[in-house]
């Protein structure tokens, strides 16, 4: 039951710095132009070395963030991220030494701009934390009912989740790592989109981790991982509607997926159509997931909430 899930809200200055570097390095629109100016030189030098090493730059930054979120040291996080991005094992130490100082420069520039970040994040996280305490258990209970018809497995919901709060760079963002039972969120003070409250982003990330863990542990059919991930969006939105957090006859699937940086407009339209078609279905969830899988464009692959980083 959802009541067994507790979230520990933790301000995370180190992840904030890494997230800012990631945003600048990947040329993602950034709300803090000053930070963009401060970090562009060191992260560009990091990227240049990554390109020279012929590794997957996007994979490097994603895995680097996951390691920092798990409180791994910068140097070790860098080495592990390089391996995940395809660096030759014999070259990892050399490449790490070449870029870790630049990462350190970016970190120091960020923390100098936000010298009291830990205290600020604690204050910024408070409204969302209070909103989650009010609506979170109800949202997860509603999601569980939709999937399991009032009888979710005992281990469906994670008992403990750590939520790492970071300085907003994109006006609302988040991601998760089911393996470590951790998620991260930009500590925005108000809802970015009133029609899709931020508390629903939290519910979506917690649900995504539950789906990921359960599917990997119980199913050999990993082809259903993608539809499982996509279904998490309307499930959470519909739960929000039950609690009067979402208004209107049509679920704002497209708006939510855009806000959560998950999928594109074509995928969102397909998910919305599938949701409408299966509303009155009595078929088991796996059967309905296969229907969604058949509706998806062939080019879609490897998408999950954990890629929302």
Per-range role (PLM):
Residues 52-140:
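Long, mid-chain structured domain cores
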Residues 134-144, 199-203, 229-232:
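Well-ordered, non-membrane alpha-helical segments in soluble/globular domains
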């Amino acid at each position: 039951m959802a009541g067994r899930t507790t979230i520990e809200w933790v301000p995370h200055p180190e992840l904030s710095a890494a997230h800012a570097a990631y945003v600048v390095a990947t040329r993602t629109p950034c709300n803090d132009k000053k930070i963009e100016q401060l970090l562009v030189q060191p992260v560009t030098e990091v990227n240049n070395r990554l390109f020279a090493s012929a590794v997957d730059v996007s994979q490097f930054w994603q895995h680097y963030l996951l390691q920092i979120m798990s409180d791994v040291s910068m140097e070790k996080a860098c080495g592990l991220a390089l391996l995940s991005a395809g660096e030759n094992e014999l070259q990892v130490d050399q490449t790490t030494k070449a870029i870790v100082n630049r990462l350190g420069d970016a970190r120091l520039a960020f923390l100098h701009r936000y010298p009291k970040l830990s205290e600020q994040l604690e204050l910024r996280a408070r409204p969302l934390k209070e909103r989650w305490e009010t609506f979170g258990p109800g949202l997860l209970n509603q999601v569980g009912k939709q999937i399991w018809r009032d009888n979710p497995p005992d281990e469906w919901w994670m008992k403990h989740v750590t939520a790492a709060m970071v300085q907003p760079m994109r006006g609302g963002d988040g991601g998760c790592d089911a393996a470590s039972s951790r998620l991260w969120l930009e500590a925005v003070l108000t809802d970015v989109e009133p029609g899709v409250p931020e508390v629903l982003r939290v519910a979506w990330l917690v649900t995504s981790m539950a789906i990921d863990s359960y599917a990997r542990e119980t199913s050999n059919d990993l082809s259903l991982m993608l539809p499982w991930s996509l279904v998490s969006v309307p499930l959470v939105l519909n739960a929000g509607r039950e609690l009067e957090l979402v208004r209107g006859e049509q679920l704002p699937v497209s708006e939510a997926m855009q806000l959560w940086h998950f999928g594109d407009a074509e995928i969102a339209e397909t998910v919305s159509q599938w949701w409408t078609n299966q509303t009155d279905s009595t078929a088991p969830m796996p059967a309905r997931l296969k229907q969604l899988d058949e509706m998806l464009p062939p080019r879609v692959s490897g998408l999950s909430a954990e890629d929302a980083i």
